[in-house]
């Protein structure tokens, strides 16, 4: 069946190509057709984050970008010294991995800091430091969510693992498969139920939000790496390390610990 496309006059699809017929990959073995709306959205030409005149990694001193980095995608600053994006398939895979890891890192960074912040402001936790909290499951009473014994008790590490696999797997499966009706265009930005506030309805605002997401996500991944190193070196949470540094910046900083750090002590 030949694919047919048309331009719709609806304000939300004006000037955009919509695929009407299914491809062979969208027809399952039993002959059932999964209709998937495919809309090609281009980044706004006036945006400083997209296109050949976008912001580069070294500003005016960046030099010429590789030919395959055209500024089509958010977070493209024209820098790829290792050539990781030269192959289109590898680039598509790495782009998806980066976005997903960015989102997990942003959630993880918040989860590392927020309980410690609450604990420092009087909220009672069994253990608020992120890398110590999990060990509470082996205590006599198990692990209470939010430190409240009236909430669900987590007393089995296998049960927690199973719940996480089921819940996370269900969400990821829903995202990748495009929902029960296959209505999602892009598994990275599924919209629909994943956008209850309608933040992606305006194309220009959505394009800018993609850039903000990838920039904050990259920062969050570096933050998580820093939290891991802090946990190994100091044995303290991020806010406690920050408080120590502010109280005595000369003796509590990365250089001081790097020059005095002895593994295992």
Curated annotation (Swiss-Prot):
Q: How does it sit in the membrane?
A: Multi-pass membrane protein
Query: Would you say which domain of life the source belongs to?
Result: Eukaryota
- Annotated cofactor note: Binds at least 14 chlorophylls (8 Chl-a and 6 Chl-b) and carotenoids such as lutein and neoxanthin.
Q: Where is the transit peptide?
A: 1-35
* Residues at which chlorophyll b 4 binds: 164, 175
> Which positions does UniProt annotate for chlorophyll b 1 binding?
57
Q: Which Pfam families match?
A: Chloroa_b-bind
Q: List positions binding chlorophyll a 6.
A: 245, 254
GO terms for CC? Answer: chloroplast thylakoid membrane; photosystem I; photosystem II
Q: Which residues bind chlorophyll b 5?
A: 164, 261
Modification N2-acetylarginine, positions: 36
Q: Does the keyword Thylakoid apply?
A: yes
Q: Which residues cross the membrane?
A: 99-119, 151-171, 219-239
Which positions does UniProt annotate for chlorophyll b 2 binding? 103, 152, 181
Q: Which InterPro entries match?
A: Chloro_AB-bd_pln, Chloroa_b-bind
Instruction: Summarize where chlorophyll a 4 binds, as residue positions.
Output: 216
What is its biological role?
A: The light-harvesting complex (LHC) functions as a light receptor, it captures and delivers excitation energy to photosystems with which it is closely associated.
* Record remark: domains: The N-terminus of the protein extends into the stroma where it is involved with adhesion of granal membranes and post-translational modifications; both are believed to mediate the distribution of excitation energy between photosystems I and II.
Subunit comment for this entry?
The LHC complex consists of chlorophyll a-b binding proteins.
**What family does this belong to?**
Belongs to the light-harvesting chlorophyll a/b-binding (LHC) protein family.
Its name, as the record gives it, is: Chlorophyll a-b binding protein 1B, chloroplastic
Q: Which organism is the protein's source?
A: Solanum lycopersicum
| Gene this protein is translated from | CAB1B
């Amino acid at each position: 069946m030949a694919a047919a496309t048309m331009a719709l006059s609806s304000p939300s699809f004006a000037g955009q190509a919509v695929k009407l017929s299914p491809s062979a990959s969208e027809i399952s073995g039993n002959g059932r057709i999964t209709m998937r709306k495919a809309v090609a959205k281009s980044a706004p030409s006036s945006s400083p984050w997209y296109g050949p005149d976008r912001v580069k990694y070294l500003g005016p001193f960046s030099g010429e970008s590789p030919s395959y980095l055209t500024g089509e995608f958010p977070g493209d600053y024209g820098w790829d010294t290792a050539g990781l994006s030269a192959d289109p398939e590898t680039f598509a895979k790495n782009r998806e991995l980066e976005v997903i890891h960015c989102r997990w890192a942003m959630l993880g960074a918040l989860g590392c800091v927020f309980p410690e912040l609450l604990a420092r402001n009087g909220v009672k936790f069994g253990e608020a430091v992120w890398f110590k909290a999990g060990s509470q499951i082996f205590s006599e009473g198990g692990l209470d969510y939010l430190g409240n014994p009236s909430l669900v008790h987590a007393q089995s590490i296998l049960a927690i693992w199973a719940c996480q696999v089921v819940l996370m797997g269900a969400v990821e499966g829903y995202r990748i498969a495009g929902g029960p009706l296959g209505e999602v265009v892009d598994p990275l930005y599924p919209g629909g139920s994943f956008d209850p506030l309608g933040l992606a309805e305006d194309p220009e605002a959505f394009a800018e939000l993609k850039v903000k997401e990838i920039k904050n996500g990259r920062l969050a991944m570096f933050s998580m790496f820093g939290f891991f190193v802090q946990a190994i070196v100091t044995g303290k949470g991020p806010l406690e390390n920050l408080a120590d540094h502010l109280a005595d910046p000369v003796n509590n900083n990365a250089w001081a610990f790097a020059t005095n750090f002895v593994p295992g002590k």
